[in-house]
Curated annotation (Swiss-Prot):
It comes from Salmonella typhi. InterPro entries: Asp/Orn_carbamoyltranf_P-bd, Asp/Orn_carbamoylTrfase, Asp/Orn_carbamoylTrfase_sf, Asp_carbamoyltransf_Asp/Orn-bd, Orn/put_carbamltrans, OTCase_ArgI. Belongs to the aspartate/ornithine carbamoyltransferase superfamily. OTCase family. It comes from the Bacteria. Its EC number is 2.1.3.3. It catalyses: carbamoyl phosphate + L-ornithine = L-citrulline + phosphate + H(+). Pathway: Amino-acid degradation; L-arginine degradation via ADI pathway; carbamoyl phosphate from L-arginine: step 2/2. Its main location: cytoplasm. This is Ornithine carbamoyltransferase, catabolic. SUPFAM superfamilies: Aspartate/ornithine carbamoyltransferase. Reversibly catalyzes the transfer of the carbamoyl group from carbamoyl phosphate (CP) to the N(epsilon) atom of ornithine (ORN) to produce L-citrulline. One of its GO terms (biological process) is citrulline biosynthetic process. It is found in: Cytoplasm. Keywords: Arginine metabolism, Cytoplasm, Transferase.
Amino acid sequence: MVISLKNRNFLKLLDYTPAEIQHLIDLAIELKAAKKAGCEKQTLIGKNIALIFEKTSTRTRCAFEVAAFDQGAQVTYLGPSGSQIGHKESMKDTARVLGRMYDGIEYRGFGQHIVEELGEYAGVPVWNGLTDEFHPTQILADLMTMLEHAPGKTLPELSFAYLGDARNNMGNSLMVGAAKMGMDIRLIAPKSFWPDAALVAQCREIASVTGARITLTESVEDGVHGVDFLYTDVWVSMGEPKEAWAERVSLMTPYQVNQQVVNATGNPDVKFMHCLPAFHNEHTKVGREIEMAYGLKGLEVTEEVFESAGSMVFDEAENRMHTIKAVMVATLGD
């Protein structure tokens, strides 16, 4: 079956079929191999791409810029303070302006409705670099990384546990990705931090077709048993007030990924994943503040696990670029 994603938006995985998601992962694997072999074919020569960042970024910005440059495209970066978007000009108007000048637009910011509006009115492919609800490019990188570290297996044969704040964009997106690809996902969190019930129901409906297994539990021991991968994310997301830390640390400490949790999987080959940045020691400004306030040298993951041989976080980070490149090539490439 020939799959064409030409001129499609990439706003959330719910918009894509399992075959289309697998196609993007396979393309990313091919592009990664070609880059490393020095034989990458450029398909975005002469294309101009706008990168809208209403939230700061390291990995996402670098991944989009390097991917675009590798493929021969030019980029314009519009940072949090570098445009009139939402201040003097609506997103609907911005979309219609940028769509006349650019061949593709990336957006990283706040509500999902904003990137949906951008996608509706731009007239060119729009890609979601992160919203409060979803982070689809990260999930492509995660699924690619899982396949790389489970040779001979397909995604429906893999299981993973996500510990921590399961109601954030990563919890939402991992659940959607697992449902679409027929995987076994366990979301382990306090019940008040489970994903929205409507999204859970939607994912379970998808799972009834794909064979995915979706488990929501407060029990770490039950949830992690037998999984292939352990996944976590920060306990306080971008945009949440600093005052949320005290309550969050109290609620989430039992869900920290530490060696005890690794052992509880019963899988000597279990791998660790994190979308980054991670609070795993006191070597950052925030890390030092956390240590002083709560006496903790790591939050969602310990230094021991983060730096262990089973940690795939930097493979995962690299794969952000390859999967983002695949999205741009598939939707915009010649």
